[in-house]
């Protein structure tokens, strides 16, 4: 067994033995989901996100690919794909880091300290810089709608969109049961 594959297995086992819920895809160690809780003292506290992680063949010498499956409102996360703009993972990754670092350090730092000057979600970045209270309210709305603990995050995919009513309406008569699910036909 080569060194990168041994390291991949060791890092996966370390992650699985931590407090994170890990679900492998296709019974392999190359792709998996991790349940990630929003960091304390952040706008995301109390939210739970499903994160997809893909390990390249050259892991740990090449960084893992990380993306939010559960929809999140953040300047550095693409709202449609869930892709994360995270320099530490994408550009400054080192083989000294492991998978637990991604979930205990890198993602919490991203959520605690968004960078609106290097956005993947331009609308979130603009709102954050222009109207901080409105931005914070939108983050909380997304957390309440999509990142509730204990609910199936498959129904809250990053490529799902809010309807016009859900996105910006003050109409309290809206029926929240009519949530569109990405990849499924409308009834």
Swiss-Prot record:
GO biological process assignments: protein ubiquitination; ubiquitin-dependent protein catabolic process
Keyword Nucleotide-binding: yes
Stretches with biased composition (Acidic residues): 157-179
Species of origin: Arabidopsis thaliana (Mouse-ear cress)
Gene3D superfamilies assigned to the protein according to its UniProt record, in alphabetical order: Ubiquitin Conjugating Enzyme (3.10.110.10)
The entry's keywords: ATP-binding, Nucleotide-binding, Transferase, Ubl conjugation pathway
Protein task: Accepts the ubiquitin from the E1 complex and catalyzes its covalent attachment to other proteins.
Tissue-level expression: Expressed in antipodal cells of developing seeds and in the vascular junction between the cotyledons or leaves and the hypocotyl. Not expressed in pollen.
EC number: 2.3.2.23
EC class name: transferase
GO molecular function: ATP binding; ubiquitin conjugating enzyme activity; ubiquitin-protein transferase activity
Ranges where the record places region Disordered: 145-187
Name of this protein: Ubiquitin-conjugating enzyme E2 4
Family, per entry: Belongs to the ubiquitin-conjugating enzyme family.
Domain UBC core: 1-148
Reactions mediated catalytically: S-ubiquitinyl-[E1 ubiquitin-activating enzyme]-L-cysteine + [E2 ubiquitin-conjugating enzyme]-L-cysteine = [E1 ubiquitin-activating enzyme]-L-cysteine + S-ubiquitinyl-[E2 ubiquitin-conjugating enzyme]-L-cysteine
Pathway entry: Protein modification; protein ubiquitination
Induction: Not induced by heat shock.
Biased composition (Basic and acidic residues): 145-156
Gene: UBC4
SMART domains: UBCc
Active site annotation, chain numbering: 85 (glycyl thioester intermediate)
The keyword ATP-binding belongs to this UniProt entry's keyword annotation: yes
């Amino acid at each position: 067994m080569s060194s990168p594959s041994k390291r991949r297995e060791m890092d996966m086992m370390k992650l699985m033995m931590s407090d994170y819920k890990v679900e492998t895809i296709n019974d392999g160690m190359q792709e998996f989901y991790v349940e990630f809780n929003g960091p304390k003292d952040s706008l995301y506290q109390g939210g739970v996100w499903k994160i997809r992680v893909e390990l390249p063949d050259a892991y740990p010498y090449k960084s893992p690919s990380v993306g939010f499956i559960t929809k999140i409102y953040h300047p550095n996360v693409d709202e449609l794909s869930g892709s994360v703009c995270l320099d530490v993972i994408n550009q400054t990754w080192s083989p000294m880091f492991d998978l637990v670092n991604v979930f205990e350090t890198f993602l919490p730092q991203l959520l605690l300290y968004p960078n609106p000057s290097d956005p993947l979600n331009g609308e979130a970045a603009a709102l954050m810089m222009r109207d901080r209270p409105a931005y914070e309210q939108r983050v909380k709305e997304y957390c309440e709608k999509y990142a509730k603990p204990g609910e199936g995050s498959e129904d809250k995919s990053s490529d799902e969109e809010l309807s016009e009513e859900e996105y910006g309406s003050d109409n309290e008569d809206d029926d929240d049961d009519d949530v569109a699910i990405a990849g499924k036909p409308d009834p």
